[in-house]
Structure formats: structure tokens, C-alpha cells
């Protein structure tokens, strides 16, 4: 079993690092009391559900229990468990700026004095920092750069980091797709709903596909859409994004949006992308 202890300065990116590790297959827990670490690992090893990689965020919020951390880590290592300490740090200036931007009190600040709180925290964390396997300074890192640092630190070069793309058709009359990163309105295309023999078919049927793509503007739109998505994929990946939801909307979510969503998925898959297609309003067909 591999256990990563994510710790470090408040505001340095422990939560973001935990989310990155979760995306990479780690079972993650936030604000784990050090005194419960041994018990949790013991329960995990005895569990029927096989968990091989765990990441626990342990920080100064643990109060007096934080002093138990190094003792717990030593005991885990004595059990032949692979324990690594990932320590997140940042300059005082950056930490102060982050706290002011988010308007949150530092856990060790006295009378709102952030600088003094940071100083107190550095002193309390000095032993853990000196024992860390890896220290990442996030002062000037974007989320994407932090992700790449973590991949490098834990030798996860073989992890599948390809952006997962979800293409979802929907009908505007049933509401916009709220969780979409990108939304495209295809109501500019002729609507097969008004052709009696096509009305009952859906965009999954050949007759609707043939009708929609019988218009030059549909083919031109698809070509431009594929080009744009392929342009954006590496940009999103660079910033650490792991999932991209693309919404394709028409009036009812049955004809045009479905045909375009299916065609977009096929084109992206043909380019080697990892794509999943779904049709939100299929229940209304």
C-alpha cells in the first residue's frame, strides 16, 4: 500500500493537490487527525475493497494532535507501508495575498495578524518539512503546473492523463445544460421536426443524420467545431483540466443536437480522443 501525507502551509495548495491525486486514482481524505491515521490505515488493509493508494491531507487544523503525525508515520513505515510526505509551501507574500483574496482567517492568526500566523505555522511545521520526501513551492505555479509537478514527483508518467470529453445533446426548451464547459446552439440548422415523415425519428436514426448533414452548413459547422475542440484540448490539459463537457443544443433535444453530438463524438474518437456521448433529454422522445 502507498500512503501519501499531504501537508504544509495553510494556503499553499494542499486541497488542490489532494484533488489532483484523487484524479490520479488515490483514495483521498481531507483534514485527517494524525491520531486516527494508524486506525484508518489498519481498517483499509482489512477492508474487502482493495485500496492500494491513499492520500491524506494533514495540517495544522489538527491542533495538538498534529504532534502525533511523525510518530504515526514512523509506525506505518515499521509496518512496511510505503509512506511519502508531500509538503506544500509558498512565500509569505503569496500566502498573505491568497488569504486576503479569499478573505479567510489564518488558523493561527492572533487578532487577524496573518503574518504572525504564518510565522507560527512555519515554526510548528519545521520538523515535518525537514522530513518531507518532496517539497513543492506553489508561489508561481498554475494548477496545470502543479499537476505536472505531482505527476513527476510520484513518477506517474504512465498514468492516463488524456482529457475525458463528454458530449451531451439537450433541448433548450427543457433548460440549458448547467454543467457544460462549452455550449453550442445548432438551432440555425433546418429542423426535421416539421417534416412529417421525420418527426418521430431521432438523431440516432439514419434518416435524420442524412437530413441534417444534407446541408452544407451542418458539415461546415462540424468541421469548424472539431478544429476548435482539438485546438482547445491541449490548452485545457495544460491548465490541469481532466474533464470537458460539451453541450450541443437544439429546440427539443431529439433531432439536430443528437445528430451533431453523434457526429462530433465519432470525429473526436477517430482522432484518438477519449469521448463519451449521451443525450440528456432522451426521456422526452
UniProtKB/Swiss-Prot annotation:
Chain residues that bind GTP: 59-62
UniProt keyword annotations, A-Z: ATP-binding, GTP-binding, Nucleotide-binding
Keyword RNA-binding belongs to the record: no
GO MF terms, alphabetically ordered: ATP binding; GTP binding
InterPro entries tied to this protein: P-loop_NTPase, RapZ-like, RapZ-like_N, RapZ_C
Entry-linked Pfam families: PapZ_C (PF22740), RapZ-like_N (PF03668)
Taxonomy, superkingdom: Bacteria
UniProt: ATP binding residues: 8-15
Recorded family membership: Belongs to the RapZ-like family.
Function: Displays ATPase and GTPase activities.
PANTHER family xref list: RNASE ADAPTER PROTEIN RAPZ
Protein name: Nucleotide-binding protein FMG_1084
Organism name: Finegoldia magna (strain ATCC 29328 / DSM 20472 / WAL 2508) (Peptostreptococcus magnus)
Amino acid at each position: 500500500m502507498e500512503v501519501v501525507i499531504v501537508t504544509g502551509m495553510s494556503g499553499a495548495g494542499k486541497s488542490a493537490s489532494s484533488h489532483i491525486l484523487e484524479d490520479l486514482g488515490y483514495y483521498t481524505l481531507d483534514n485527517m487527525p494524525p491520531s486516527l491515521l494508524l486506525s484508518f490505515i489498519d481498517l483499509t488493509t482489512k477492508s474487502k475493497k482493495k485500496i492500494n493508494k491513499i492520500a491524506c491531507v494533514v495540517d495544522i487544523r489538527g491542533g495538538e494532535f498534529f504532534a502525533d503525525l511523525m510518530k504515526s508515520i514512523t509506525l506505518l513505515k515499521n509496518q512496511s507501508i510505503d509512506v511519502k510526505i508531500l509538503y506544500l509551501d509558498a512565500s509569505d507574500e503569496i500566502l498573505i495575498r491568497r488569504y486576503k483574496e479569499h478573505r479567510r482567517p489564518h488558523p493561527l492568526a492572533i487578532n487577524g495578524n496573518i503574518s504572525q500566523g504564518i510565522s507560527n505555522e512555519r515554526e510548528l511545521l519545521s520538523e515535518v518539512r525537514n522530513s518531507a520526501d518532496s517539497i513543492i513551492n506553489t508561489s508561481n505555479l498554475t494548477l496545470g503546473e502543479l499537476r505536472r509537478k505531482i505527476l513527476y514527483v510520484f513518477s506517474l508518467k504512465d498514468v492516463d492523463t488524456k482529457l475525458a470529453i463528454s458530449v451531451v445533446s439537450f433541448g433548450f426548451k427543457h433548460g440549458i445544460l448547467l454543467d457544460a464547459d462549452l455550449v453550442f446552439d445548432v438551432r440555425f440548422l433546418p429542423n426535421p421536426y416539421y417534416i412529417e415523415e421525420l418527426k418521430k425519428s431521432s438523431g440516432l436514426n439514419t434518416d435524420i443524420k442524412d437530413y441534417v448533414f444534407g446541408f452544407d452548413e451542418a458539415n461546415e459547422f462540424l468541421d469548424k467545431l472539431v478544429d476548435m475542440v482539438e485546438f482547445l484540448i491541449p490548452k485545457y490539459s495544460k491548465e490541469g483540466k481532466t474533464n470537458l463537457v460539451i453541450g450541443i443544443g437544439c429546440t427539443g433535444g431529439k433531432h439536430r443536437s443528437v445528430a451533431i453530438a453523434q457526429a462530433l463524438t465519432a470525429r473526436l474518437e477517430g482522432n484518438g480522443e477519449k469521448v463519451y456521448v449521451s443525450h440528456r433529454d432522451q426521456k422526452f422522445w
